[in-house]
């Protein structure tokens, strides 16, 4: 513990020294990060964070017939189907915030909430289409990316072991004012991480990244921060490689999104979330590569493998019949 504190102290001192020696780069990175937050992050994310928590609070515990078969396949507790809407429409980290709020309200057990984190935190369509439509000559590429993103997240929900637990416990939801206050706190945390990582990327771009091939440079930026990674994809000339990189970055979310999620989720372990993101990244890379190289047979094979794994997981975990809410 003492050694870790010592290393943190050295790192903080080194960071302050870098800021003093090259303040212009830090200021440029901070300005770029603030502009990114004002122009893209806040408009595409803040309304979805508020609506995601309100939606999950209003519908949590209520059965949504069209989504119930999907919930059963994903081994979700009965009554939590509304979290899928937040997971696939809200954007990072709206899905994780909705799961965390359900856990904090006592509607979800800790184990169920931690497992849901593995596939309920994804890029939203507002961000995905806003970022990717200008990157590809055909708008169909953006739809393909979204489809692969959703399919890989669903695959994670099937592949990660678990069993359908008891229905959610209905709790009285918080006030709308409390929801908005919480959303503002989450939004401020998200923007702080975006600005910090934009400064880090500015230093790396100035000192190291310009030496690397464009594909590697874009991949490194995407692993650090998703928005900047997507903006840097124009450096990659091959549209096929660009789509594969974009698919992987959207699935992984980047270190910045991970820190946003960790900061927004309290009282839950993140091990299953990390595992889920790695699995989603692998699935997205495989499916996007199959799509751009026209290896369409990979998709049915992928479906068969996931289906077989579903049967195996049911045998391992047992089939529990949930009681209706």
Where are these regions (language model features)?
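Alpha-helical transmembrane segments of multi-pass small-molecule/ion transporters
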Residues: 48-49, 100, 114-172, 260, ...
């Amino acid at each position: 513990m003492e050694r870790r504190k010592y290393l943190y102290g050295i790192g903080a001192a080194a960071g302050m020294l870098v800021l003093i020696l090259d303040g212009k780069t830090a200021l440029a990175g901070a300005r770029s990060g603030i502009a990114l937050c004002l122009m893209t992050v806040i408009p595409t994310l803040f309304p979805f964070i508020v609506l995601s928590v309100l939606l999950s609070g209003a519908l949590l515990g209520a059965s949504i017939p069209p989504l119930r078969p999907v919930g059963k396949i994903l081994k979700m507790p009965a009554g939590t189907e509304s979290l899928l809407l937040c997971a696939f429409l809200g954007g990072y980290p709206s899905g994780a915030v909705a799961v965390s709020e359900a856990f904090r309200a006592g509607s979800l057990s800790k184990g169920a909430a931690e497992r849901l984190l593995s596939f309920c935190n994804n890029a939203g369509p507002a961000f995905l289409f806003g970022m990717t439509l200008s990157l590809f000559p055909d708008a169909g590429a953006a739809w393909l990316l979204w489809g692969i993103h959703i399919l890989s997240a669903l695959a994670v929900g099937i592949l990660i072991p678990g069993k359908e637990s008891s229905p959610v416990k209905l709790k009285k939801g918080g006030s709308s004012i409390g929801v908005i206050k919480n959303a503002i706190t989450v939004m401020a945390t998200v923007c702080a991480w975006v600005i910090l990582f934009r400064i880090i990327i500015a230093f790396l771009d100035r000192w190291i990244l310009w030496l690397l091939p464009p594909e590697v440079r874009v991949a490194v930026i995407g692993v650090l921060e998703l928005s900047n990674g997507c903006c840097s994809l124009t450096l990659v000339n091959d549209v096929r490689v660009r789509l594969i990189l974009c698919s992987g970055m959207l699935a992984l979310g980047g270190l910045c999104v991970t820190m946003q999620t960790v900061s927004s989720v309290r009282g839950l372990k993140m091990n299953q979330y990390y595992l889920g993101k790695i699995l989603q990244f692998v699935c997205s890379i495989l499916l996007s590569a199959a799509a751009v190289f026209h290896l369409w047979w990979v998709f049915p094979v992928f479906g068969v493998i996931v289906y077989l794994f579903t049967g195996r997981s049911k045998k391992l975990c047992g089939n529990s019949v949930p009681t209706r809410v």
